[in-house]
Amino acid sequence: MSTLSFKVLDLDFPAGSKNKTATLVTGESEALLVDAAFTRADGHRLAAEILDSGKTLTTVFVSHADPDFYFGAEVIADAFPDARFVATPIVIEHIQHSYEGKLKAWAALGPNLPTRLVDIEPLTGDLTLEGHTFQLKGGPDALPDRHYLWQAEHRALLGGVLLFQQEHVWVADTATPEARAAWIGQLDEMAFLEAELVVPGHRLPGTPADSSAISATRAYLLAFEEELDKAADGAALNDALVKRYPDNGMLIAAQIGAKVAKGEMKWG
């Protein structure tokens, strides 16, 4: 069986600010891509990475339904027409339901916006690459759209939207304490695996791809609950989070998440 290589690529989100990752996994002759970028430009950059690898792209796994996970997909599909795009059924449903609204929300991207949705096949089980199994894990009842991949031989965990490294954590889609508690439960499940490579869906470039992403995300979620109880409104909660995590990126996550948690804004 071949040995796999994992390359973590730092991409734009929002445009002009590198906070999103994609992961290119390569074997002897084939490649798997996890997540497909936020912009058409980054879609081209991913296509170039795949071409430079010299491997045949067989599968693209879209791990979540937010635009930074799939807006670049059409460029990759055009470059590699034989590659399969897969996602869990609920992620496909969310993408199809929200796509037009997300185009309007991110209209400032202009020509960097996608022009169409690619065909995405439902994934209900594990993925394989050259005989290596990537287990599809997660998706509890409280968070059915949140999965991650686990490759046991290489002790590699591709965490998607569940993991953040030195970023403000995106909590706007987990507006209740119950949802955030379920998230923490998934993080504890991840920690139990004792992974050696841990790829967060969002990170500041240069930060480590290891288990510290799990503990950092967990600590942030607990801090969010603590500051939420003390804050009078969304602005106060945002200020408290920024003060507590002055070096974290993705300030937009703190701003929007605080408003949603305080009932000042609806999201999704």
Predicted segments, located by residue:
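Short Pro/Gly-enriched beta-strand edge/turn motifs at strand-loop
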Residues: 2-11, 107-109, 128-133
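Metallo-beta-lactamase
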Residues: 38, 133, 140-141, 146-215, ...
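Active-site HxH/HxHxD metal-binding segment of metal-dependent hydrolases
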Residues: 48-126
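Accessory terminal helices/loops
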Residues: 94, 192-197, 205-268
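Short acidic-hydrophobic surface loop/beta-edge motif
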Residues: 25, 124-129
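Divalent metal-coordination and catalytic microenvironments
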Residues: 25, 35, 50, 64, ...
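Conserved beta-strand hairpin/beta-sheet module of binuclear metal-dependent hydrolase folds
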Residues: 2-52, 148-160
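Active-site neighborhood of phospho(di)ester-bond hydrolases with catalytic His/Asp-centered motifs
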Residues: 34-36, 58-66, 86-89, 157-160, ...
